[in-house]
Amino acid sequence: MLIYLFEWLSHYFKGLEVFSSYISVRIIMISITSLLITLALGRPMISWLQRMQIGQIVRDDGPQSHFSKRNTPTMGGVLILSSVIISCLLWGDLTSIYLWILILVVIFFGAIGFFDDYLKLVLKHPKGLRAKHKFALQSIFSIVLAIVLFYLLSKNGQMSLSIPFSKSLYIPMGIVIFVVLAFFIINGSSNAVNLTDGLDGLAIVPVVLVAAGLGIYAYIETNSTLANYLLFNYLGNPGLAEVAVFCAAVCGSGLAFLWFNSHPAEVFMGDVGSLTLGAVLGVIAVMVRQELIFFIMGLLFVVEALSVMLQVGSYKLRNGKRIFRMAPIHHHFELKGWPETKVVIRFWIISLILFLIGLAAIKVR
């Protein structure tokens, strides 16, 4: 909304047009806005969650150090999502259908995560929303969204899979392959980030890094000058540049949330945050046609999810034998004696390295 205000004011005050005409300025402003909103609302929300006794449930078979986390306020993801939506409504171009799609993803997956958390933490339902019901909701939405994105993106012929570190290698995709790939990316990312969110600050830093990386790609690919110079396919779809603005909002809010989520965590994001942020990253990767770059930058999430799949598979197929001491894999390292902070920081370092590798693919082609 503010871009329309500044556009009107620029007729009377010289210089204000930068806030409406330059997406780079809006990227900076939305990141600052989302950061400040999250910082401002963080303490009141934590206090409210404490009064409502909406606290973390800790597994009895987990690391003993986690027992101190019991009853730590949860569902802090509402803070992140609210900040992102408010910031986008303030600084986003509201004529962009891609921005509205991302906001819809936040609302839909946020509702699933919120209901799951509500069942577990408020109604004390031990398992929350049943896995099959959760997967069904995610799947229906992801398939419908994938079909919509196919028709939106295909208007400008942007239906090829970009291969990292290659100047001209693209794999064309029809609607079936596109929808299947998008389905697995969106659902897989949503659940992988959810599994990663098990230690203080562990998930939010990789989320911010991946969002920043995808935002950089979105900015390059929707700028004809940069895209041509760096030999990327120019994504000229009207409104697609707002993806970079949305990514900046996620980064700002995520960094501010880390202020409260760092060890010892004062609040956890819960399923309402992790499921939604994972889904959003997957949708963004599909929008900017950088699914493989997303795989590289988000490889930490992939490893966390694979560790759970391997653990479950081994337990069922090998008569109760496990590969890891506990899954997801971050708990395995805890049970090996690594302090929680060391696990988290080392995983952050890995995520930073993956982020830099993903950025290197911009120029190393």
Swiss-Prot record:
- Topology of the protein relative to the lipid bilayer: Multi-pass membrane protein
Origin, by domain of life?
Bacteria
Tell where it localizes: Cell inner membrane
What GO terms in the biological process aspect are recorded for it? cell division; cell wall organization; peptidoglycan biosynthetic process; regulation of cell shape
Predominant place of localization: membrane
Q: Which UniProt keywords apply?
A: Cell cycle, Cell division, Cell inner membrane, Cell membrane, Cell shape, Cell wall biogenesis/degradation, Magnesium, Membrane, Metal-binding, Peptidoglycan synthesis, Transferase, Transmembrane, Transmembrane helix
- Cofactors that this protein relies on: Mg(2+)
Cellular component GO terms, alphabetically?
Answer: plasma membrane
Pathway it belongs to? Cell wall biogenesis; peptidoglycan biosynthesis
Q: Does the keyword Cell cycle apply?
A: yes
EC identifiers of the protein: 2.7.8.13
Q: Which residues cross the membrane?
A: 22-42, 74-94, 95-115, 134-154, 168-188, 201-221, 240-260, 267-287, 292-312, 342-362
Q: Which GO terms describe its molecular function?
A: metal ion binding; phospho-N-acetylmuramoyl-pentapeptide-transferase activity; UDP-N-acetylmuramoyl-L-alanyl-D-glutamyl-meso-2,6-diaminopimelyl-D-alanyl-D-alanine:undecaprenyl-phosphate transferase activity
As its record notes, the protein acts as a catalyst of: UDP-N-acetyl-alpha-D-muramoyl-L-alanyl-gamma-D-glutamyl-meso-2,6-diaminopimeloyl-D-alanyl-D-alanine + di-trans,octa-cis-undecaprenyl phosphate = di-trans,octa-cis-undecaprenyl diphospho-N-acetyl-alpha-D-muramoyl-L-alanyl-D-glutamyl-meso-2,6-diaminopimeloyl-D-alanyl-D-alanine + UMP
Entry-linked Pfam families: Glycos_transf_4, MraY_sig1
PANTHER family given for it? PHOSPHO-N-ACETYLMURAMOYL-PENTAPEPTIDE-TRANSFERASE, PHOSPHO-N-ACETYLMURAMOYL-PENTAPEPTIDE-TRANSFERASE HOMOLOG
HAMAP family assigned to the protein according to its UniProt record, in alphabetical order: MraY
Stated role? Catalyzes the initial step of the lipid cycle reactions in the biosynthesis of the cell wall peptidoglycan: transfers peptidoglycan precursor phospho-MurNAc-pentapeptide from UDP-MurNAc-pentapeptide onto the lipid carrier undecaprenyl phosphate, yielding undecaprenyl-pyrophosphoryl-MurNAc-pentapeptide, known as lipid I.
The similarity annotation says: Belongs to the glycosyltransferase 4 family. MraY subfamily.
The name of this protein is Phospho-N-acetylmuramoyl-pentapeptide-transferase
